[in-house]
Amino acid sequence: MEKIEDQFASLHIVRRSSEPKEPTYLLGIDTSKTVQADKGGLVAVLCSNGSIRIYDKETLHLLREFGGSPGLLSGVSFANSCDSVYSASTDGTVKCWDARGASEKPVQLFKGYPSCSFISFDVNCKDHVICAGAEKVDEDALLVFWDARFTSQDLSTRDPLGAYSETHSDDITQVRFHPSNPNLVVSGSTDGLVNVFDLSADKEEDALVATCNSVSSVSCIGWCGKDYKQIYCMTHDEGFCWWDLNHLDTDEPITCLNIQDVREITDVKDGHLDYLIGGLYHEKMDRLFVIGGTNTGKIHLLSCTSAGLTHVTSLHGGHAATVRSFCWNVSEDSLLTGGEDAQLLLWKPGAMEKTFTKKDSLKIASSVQQRVRVHSSDSYKKRKQQ
């Protein structure tokens, strides 16, 4: 099996999206999970102007655009079993569109409680449950849940199944369901905490499996490791943490790695690291990688072990500004990237490299303002179920 380092290093740009009418930052990317012989794959991109653009996966031709709704959108995700695409909104809803449909209006609307302003969400692996994280209001920072199963072809509005309110004390910036267990979900917050829940429990206090502390505001979380029994997180001040949940019921520490500022300790060959973008767990190789970059558009691949982060290789010549999002396709070994230069790029290994002129960095203000708050307390704690 070819090493992912070699796969990544051999990537070249094969497609670039067409120039949009309104240049925006590309803040999030996801691809359709369903395979249809008569239909090509889709790419959904979250833009800083509050819209979601749907592209053909191979040609990167813009097919349609969803937008115009009140509130800012956060996150973008395809369903696992169909071509529905979701996003959370600060107007207190999670919206669902038909990515192949003609209508620009949502086909489902998941309403939160009156005070909710959602800034994160995810859909579980069976497409049965949606969970969204809200900004703190008064003393409450809510995780809200809905039944996501379709019951009608017409526009339907769903009220929440319930909410968790006792486990975070500030804005909930990240929510991620387990890739194969529909009952497990992890959340991250500006309070620095990363919480793991088992939704099969009846009460919130019983559902809380573990609480880990990143000691800073959480910007990204994900599952990794064999059977996805590990979690990692990144912070708004470029910290990185990695925990092993296999050790919850042992005397072994669950912290595999805790780096307060990756920029200070990572040696990048012939360059430097300005920020972290996200994590990449390669299931077949059972290896965790961290993706970072520079303000001029270079992308770095870092290998993650308990000894630290090691620079593996870099991609350059594609973006001209900060890269905000990526999506790695394991089956095709291809990469989609989006950035502040408004460019969506498709990279593939071994392809004939095409010559492109990098676009100038956009001089526009991002609609997403991240607040960084540093906290200090125990590196982690665990709650045992009674």
From Swiss-Prot:
Query: Cross-referenced PROSITE patterns, in alphabetical order?
Result: WD_REPEATS_2, WD_REPEATS_REGION
Recorded source organism is Mus musculus
Q: Does the keyword Repeat apply?
A: yes
What gene does the UniProt entry assign to this protein? Wdr89
Q: Which Pfam families match?
A: WD40
Recite the UniProt keywords alphabetically. Repeat, WD repeat
Supply the name of the protein: WD repeat-containing protein 89
The WD repeats are found at: 21-65, 68-107, 112-156, 167-207, 213-253, 318-357
Q: Name one GO biological process term.
A: corpus callosum development
